[in-house]
Amino acid sequence: MDSRCGVCKYIISDCERYVSDNTFYHVKCFICKICKCELPPCFRGKHASLMCGDCEIKLNAPKCFKSHFPIHSVSVVARNKEFHNNCFTCISCNEIIKGGFQYSDELFYCSKCDIIKPPPLPPPLIYKAPIATSKATTSITSPLPTKIPILSTANLIPPLSSSSPLATQISPKTSTIATTTVETTTAETTLPSPFKISQLKNSGDNIYSLSSPSSSSSSSSSSSSSSSSPPNTFNKSSDFLRNPLNNNVKSSSSSIGGNFVNKSQQQQQPIDSCSKSSISISPSSPRPTEDDIKEQVFLLQKQSVQLQIQQQLQQRQIEQLNKNQLGVQKPLNQQPQQQQQQFKPQSPNLSNNDTLDSFSNLNQSLPPPPLINTTTFSNPLLKTKNQSFPTPPTSHIIKENQSQQIPKPSSIDEVDQLPLPPPPITPIPSPSSSSIIINNQQQQQQESQLPPPPPTSIIIDQSILLPPPPPSTEILPQQQSPKLYKPRPKPIVLPPPPLDMEQLPLPPPPLLSSQINQSLKSTQHNQTTSPTIEIPIPPPLPIQKQSIPTRKPQLPQSSNPSPPSPPSPQPSSNIPPLSPKQQQEQQVEPIFSPTGSIIPTPPPPPPIFKMKPLRPQKFRAPTNYIPSLSLHRANKLSNSTEDHIKPPESLVLESSRIEKFEPTINGRKLTELLKHQTFDDIVGEVLNKRISIYKQLVKDDVIFGDVIAAGASGKVYKGIYKGRDVAIKVYSSENFCFNIDEFDREVTIMSLIDSDHPNFTRFYGANKQNKKYLFHVSELVKSGSLRDLLLDKEKPLLYFTQLSIASDIANAMKHLHSIGVIHRDLKSLNVLITEDFTAKVIDFGTSRNVDLAKHMTMNLGTSCYMSPELFKGNGYDETCDVYAFGIVLWEIIARKEPYENINSWSIPVMVAKGDRPTIPADCPSEYSKLIKACWTDKPKKRPSFKEICDTLKKISESLTLKRNKK
């Protein structure tokens, strides 16, 4: 049959033609249309075109998003971007991403690395200098960067007030020169920092200079003579710029900005005049360079540092002086007249000009007055606010005002009758001062409780001398006089009289081995719940009660005296008195030796330990597991009898706080609805009609703790809800997988599933007040997931324990499939293990009904737990959960990760080919058959979870029979 060539369209014969994709070609035409290479006879072209494999890949194959090279075979698709297997790496750790990943700003991060975003940099600080005009003054509105203190005599004097305003102005060079005086009450002024002053250089054509007059009176005259006084300005040739801190500083004059001020004159001025120094900024003809300005600022800073050092040295000297010598401030003239009249003497012997130089022997009951610091006080009785206290006096002599008088005694007998001078009034400092605050009420109480002091003062030369005050300035409480304790008399020990050995009773013989064996046999019938120690007590012996002799010691007589009995010990007040029967049992007659000493009684036989009989430990725990009662459950498993074990009352109260919440839909429970509807229809009705079937929690009732785990949709926190440890899963809008519909579906499914089932965690409720911050609360299992338990090789797992864990998972999945729910994400990470090795299945966010799952394609889940039909695009059904359970069974027996050291994006290819993890050689045959039946390629041949539960039950029963035979 003749046909035409697909390339040249000529008719070809049967002997010289090739067929590809139902198209005939000549031999010479059957070549690649791009590289013109010969194609093999069995070539099958893609896209109905004649192209070799290399050319096909170059034109039609997808390119890697990272390397931009074509992808030949297996590729990784993430976020609609294709990668090579080796190119899909984490940006942070540069490792191949296996499993989950995080995506942010078109960058991929592995689940182990956090998305690190550098914090935004703060805006740069730019100092904007004002632009000077020719006919108007401009003021600095923006705050200056730094504060540089200027050397002035005001630094050596305490400031008058800390709230004095500080104003600065810069005036340009004009016809009418204006200067602004800056009053520095705190001895500081603000100037630009050295690295910002260079910006002032190009701010305008005007030139500014800094000058400081000698006093406040000269500041007014500086404005009129600033234009014609070059000494007040500074330039390169100024001595102030060259070396303001030279040897001339040590003399009596100091240089400040080119003006010389006499220190002696300045110190003699009053406080108001010498505490103010003016700084005028006026224009000048020469233009200072940038180096001059930097040099000037450096010298000013150096000058201020030296001044601060001097002030600190002075302050330390004053503090050291105050510690060694206590200075007392005298009362002032501003005191009220009534208070001054109280201290006036009644004797006219002393005149008004007489002064009191010193006191002596003040009352010891009064505490020493505190040191008055050199700070400003608000008490009007001491000083006004505009005055400052001088430095504390170096001597202890307190001088009185002339208005106060003290009578002069006419004789020595009248010395004791003179009234003592009143103590100085202690000021109440302001909150900003650092002086000691005296509690007047406490001082008055101490004075009222003390007796009147004895007259111990002595007047010498019309003055009263004081003893040196204590070095400490703190107010100490009055020391009480120490109590005198008399030594206790030593007890008189009387030697015992000689004893007659014939009258002494003999000690009981020790127990024989036969008696001990009889006591052992008699105690075997008394079984208790805990180990007990039984010590046999010898039979009591009669004792003769005798009182302790109180007579004086006498020589022993030759007659046969009765042996004195030792004194009976008196019981303490804490020990309850014994009954007469108990006293008779405990009384044992002592045995005396010929010398009079007491012979010790023979030691009792060794204690007899009676251990409880061992019973096999129960493996399965009760169904109603409560995590807060884990200690109680552990004790219940360790003890043999369970009747004597009761949970603490506090735990019972905590568990009774949370009432069981049974969800209802239109007044009907889930069991009633499942008779007429499927589970998916019920969930769809709840979500569409927005019916709230779960308990609404208040955020204040939940206490959040540390983060336990984090995933793509949110984080899991450890918390407390009504006295019980809970797990709080938070869904935040910040996560890229956040979806409110998924949250509603998961909460609805967890509410409908029976929370009392032993293999599910208990669900307490959810909170949806904040749409961007949702969370639900469930039971906390502290032991962790099944994967953590399996990978921890230090914890041994018996085969019976492994079977029990597998049975719990199968029972949970059997309950889900019975109501028409498939889990769809069953894996070892979604199985929690309690302290008694009970398995609990969690994470129902991806659960769907069987009917809907048939029309769904694969878009979620972990690749190593997914069945082969999912990679072919088939629907998800119950058999997919069975395949995942087969992988979990292999993990339990092998205690390894499935497909270890293999890229997760290459696992689908291996699963589709039929590659499965290798079953260990020591795995039992029945268990191995169950694993192979669960992960077979044909879904119809996989067993159901009901059959799996029956198989595991038979395996465990056969294992117990083998144990009992042994």
Swiss-Prot record:
Keyword Oxidoreductase tagged: no
Any Pfam family hit: PK_Tyr_Ser-Thr
Domain Protein kinase: 702-959
Residue spans crossing the bilayer: none
Polar residues composition-biased segments: 232-269, 374-389, 513-526
Residues noted as binding ATP in the record, renumbered to the chain: 708-716, 729
LIM zinc-binding domain residues: 3-62, 63-120
SMART domains reported for this sequence: LIM, S_TKc
Composition skew (Pro residues), residue ranges: 419-430, 490-511, 561-570
GO cellular component: cytoplasm
GO terms, molecular function: ATP binding; metal ion binding; protein kinase activity; protein serine kinase activity; protein serine/threonine kinase activity
Annotated region (Disordered), positions in chain: 208-291, 331-588
Active site: 825
Catalytic activity: L-seryl-[protein] + ATP = O-phospho-L-seryl-[protein] + ADP + H(+); L-threonyl-[protein] + ATP = O-phospho-L-threonyl-[protein] + ADP + H(+)
Domain of life of the source: Eukaryota
Enzyme Commission (EC) number: 2.7.11.1
Gene3D superfamilies to which the protein is assigned, alphabetical: Cysteine Rich Protein (2.10.110.10), Transferase(Phosphotransferase) domain 1 (1.10.510.10)
Top class in the EC scheme: transferase
Protein name per the record: Probable LIM domain-containing serine/threonine-protein kinase DDB_G0286997
